[in-house]
Amino acid sequence: MSYILFDDNSRYSLQPFTHTRAIADIRCGIYTMRERWEQLLRSKTDTLTEEHLQSIYTYNTLPGILETVYGMEANVATIFVNGSVFATEALVKAINKLEAGQKLVQGDVLIAANTEDTVYYKNLNSVTEGLEAIAYEPEVQRLKNNWDIFSKNDAAIRADFSIITKGRKSAALPAHITITGKENLFIEEGAKVYAGCIINAEAGPVYIGKDAEILEGTMIRGPLAAGEHSVIKMGAKIYGATTIGPGCKVGGEINNVVFFANSNKAHDGYLGNAVIGEWCNMGADTNCSNLKNNYDEIKIWDEHTNKSVKTGLTFCGLLMGDHSKCAINTAFNTGTVVGVSSNIFGSGFPEKFVPSFCWGGSEGMTTYDINRAMETANR
């Protein structure tokens, strides 16, 4: 059996993060959505997404999947699984029980489908429409909006911690740090936690990945996930639920933030209730508001519908797409959305929506030259 993780329409409300990836490659918790599915399915997966992104995934295509996606004769049984859905053991069991010609649904949400028909991204709904519907009763959790990535991170870290630590023993806990709730702390081999660190895992689990470094004087309050080769700088104050993805460097004060991978917020400054994509960099003393002075509900700009939408949240900070950067002393307003590969600098607050490939700040924006953007990304 082979599995293809498909994008549903939530990919549009998950921008700017889905400009550069399928939904399945969004990180929330310790894992990306794909990594969680693969852990529980005990199988590699492939991807069905927008045409302009599909070529990214074909290089790693499993036998038979390419034929299924592009309409040639398939030679392997395939189940399509919604990449926006959080995988669970119970859900995996229900999916694996599907017979050819059946689909698993909850309301109008397609969770999974076992179809022998040729499937393209644009005809997925029409192909699965006539399948026998099997209702899944337990409530499924999904990524439906970009702010879900940080607001659902607490539950995701807890679930992933149970998966990744099941039947395993943590590396030795250092004697020179202060720990409360040590039964909820798991350190992978090769990770280093230096003297003077304070880790409180009573409020939620703390996972420290392989070769991660937690430098002197760091204060951590779970839930927290520090990925492989991540670094938390000296004296940092980290509140849960926070994910520091592989290769990230962070410092200052951080509260309920998801860093995807290879991004830096290495200096002082506040960042809360936020999502930072891959290969982003935030200059020293960057500060981001996450609460309106009147405590009102926060609205953010929806790039797909080209209008402001309600989040239902009182706390919402910065949502920054891949490869975007900001200079020292940058200040972001509550609920700011920054697209892909933008460069922000100067005094004052930039607009609350900064499109992709913009260069400038509060005094005006110009288009970031694509060749210069590519040069920076390639470095």
Residue ranges of each PLM-predicted region?
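Extended beta-solenoid/beta-helix repeat architectures
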Residues: 168-182, 186-277, 292-293, 319, ...
